[in-house]
Structures are given as C-alpha cells and as structure tokens.
Regions:
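A general structural signal for short secondary-structure boundary/capping elements
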Residues: 55-58, 71-73, 124-127, 273-292
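Intrinsically disordered, low-complexity N-terminal segments that are enriched in acidic
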Residues: 1-105
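Short capping/connector residues at structural and topological boundaries
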Residues: 19, 23, 49, 72, ...
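Structural beta-strand/beta-sheet cores of well-ordered domains, especially the beta-sheet scaffolds
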Residues: 2, 8, 21-23, 40, ...
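Secondary-structure boundary elements
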Residues: 97-181, 189, 261-263, 278, ...
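Glycine-rich, small/acidic residue-mixed loop/short-helix segments
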Residues: 25-35, 42-43, 246-280, 289-292
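Hydrophobic/aromatic-rich core segments of domains that either
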Residues: 138, 153, 185-273
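Glycine-rich, flexible loop/turn motifs
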Residues: 14, 88, 99, 157, ...
Length: 292
C-alpha cells in the first residue's frame, strides 16, 4: 500500500516587528477507514507559547497557536504521512429510493443534514436552478450518480481553471458568468448546483496528488497547493467526493483534511497580528506531496 507524505509550509514576512495574535490551523487530517495517519508534525517559528488542539463544529482537528513577543516573520510547517484507501466510482452503492432524481432524504437524515442542504448564495433569476435541472434532463433516466458525474464533467469541460491568490470565493453566478475560476470557485459552484437538486453538500479542503506524475514536474490541475472539492451525501453511499476541477469521483487523488458547510469555514490558516499598517510584506505557500 502506498504511503503518502505531505509537507505544507506557509510563511509570512513583515517589514517591521509585529505582535502575533491567535492563529488557527486546519492541517491535520482525521483518521478514518479511507485515510490512516501514520505520523504528523507541526513546526512553528517563532515557537508558539501555547498550542492546543480542538475539534470544530464539523469534527475537524484544529491547532490553536498563541504567541508572546514580537517578530518579523511567521513560518508554519505541517507534515504528515498517511495511507490512503479511496473509494472507486464503481464501488458506490446508493439506496434504491435515491438512485434517480427526484428523491428525498429520510426524515432523520434531513434533520441531521440541516443547512448543508440549503442554498447559501443568491439566485434571483433561478439561473443556477435552470443550469442544474438541465443536467438532470440531459441524463437518460435521471440517474443520481450519472447526473453528478455529468455535473462534475460539465464544470471541468466548460469552465477555465484560473488560480487566484486572493482570499475568499466567487459567488456561483459570477463563476458561470466569467466562465472561469479557481478550485474553490468550482467546488462552491457544484455545491450550490447540487443543493438546487435537494442534495446535501460540503466543502472539502485538502491536497491533490497523482502518483504517476509525482516528481515529473506536472500533474492534475490544482496540484502543488492546497486543493478544494465537494462532498455530496447520497443515501447508502454516504459522503461521496467529487472534484469538478479535474472531473474526479471517489477520492483516489484527493487527500481530505477538513470539511465545512461553506468555504469561509475551511481556511487552512487564519489569524491576526498587531503592528503598523504597512508591516505586512509577503506570504508564500509551498506544498509537497510525495510517495514512499
């Protein structure tokens, strides 16, 4: 079984000394049947005075670092080794009642899924509704897995990948209008489109790898950095992973770190500092994914 090694380094530089506030890091994957952690490491420079671990509302592992004193830099290096046991698309088994659109979740599931089923972004002219419903009509029989595969492929084929360093995400209608976006934007577009069909979805933050291309200087779109994709809840199959940036289904090339109801809740690093208004100089991010 392949062992994956991930190293994620984030560096902040400041022109003048600043005082660091609390920083929250979503960097440690959860052990599960599909991802077994072997070891993990978190190195912080300057060292934090207090480092504690908590589970957020979604069950993600969050490191909370506190600091004293001033500094002109902050380096956060997270690394882990893990074995990956991804689901293959052909292994997905959906309950009979959910094999075709339309269907409804059971009463208990509907309550527990809560706001993950609800639309979060404005669609006053029902443009996204029409876009999603058209996919259902185009798929013979309206099979659930087939519609979601078509949606994943449509985003990959019709929209142009355009990485953005800016924080946040584009609204789904903006991504459709521009015809381009980052992996975060594509993930959010698919989340909201699936919610148009009554499905529960979650935003996933993690890493992308292609074992065949590691070390070859090329890879899937979005590799070499943090990556974003989607989980859709399907009765019988559970939370199924879809990457619309690369038209991937089932998680073979996806290393999940955290999940959230909305992209704003899944930042790998968030924090603050106190200092002069022009103190911030630069930020750099480096991600290495290798196998052993």
């Amino acid at each position: 079984m392949t062992v994956l090694r991930v190293r994620h380094t984030t560096r902040y530089d400041y022109r003048k000394p600043v005082e660091l506030g609390e920083h929250r890091l979503m960097c440690r994957p959860r052990d599960s049947h599909d991802l077994r952690l072997i070891d993990t490491s978190l190195v912080i420079d300057p060292p934090s005075t207090v480092l504690r671990w908590v589970h957020d509302v979604f069950g993600n592992s969050i490191a909370v670092a506190s600091f004293n004193g001033s500094t002109d830099h902050l380096v956060l290096e997270s690394s882990f080794r893990a074995q990956h046991f991804p689901a293959e698309p052909g292994e997905l088994v959906v309950e009979a009642f959910a094999e075709r659109f339309p269907f409804s979740y059971s009463a208990d599931d509907a309550v527990d899924l809560g706001r993950t089923k609800e639309r979060h972004y404005a669609d006053p002219e029902h443009e996204l509704d029409r876009w999603a419903q058209a996919l259902v009509q185009e798929v013979p029989g309206g099979g659930t897995l087939e519609v979601l595969a078509a949606m994943t492929g449509r985003i990959k084929s019709q929209l142009k990948y355009a990485p953005r360093d800016a924080e946040g995400v584009q609204a789904p209608l903006e991504t459709l209008a521009l015809g381009s976006g980052s992996c975060r934007d594509f993930a959010l577009l698919m989340m909201e489109a699936a919610r148009c069909l009554g499905l529960a979805t979650r935003f996933v933050s993690g890493y992308l790898y292609d074992e065949r291309l590691i070390g070859a200087g090329a890879g899937l779109v979005g590799g070499g950095a943090t990556h974003a994709w989607v989980q859709v809840y399907l009765p019988g199959a559970g939370w199924v992973e879809y990457d619309p940036t690369n038209a991937l289904i089932g998680g073979r090339n996806l290393i999940r770190v955290g999940v959230a109801r909305d992209p704003s809740q899944a930042a790998p690093v968030s924090g603050r500092f106190t200092g002069p208004g022009d103190a911030f100089a630069a930020m750099s991010v480096s991600v290495e994914v290798t196998t052993e």
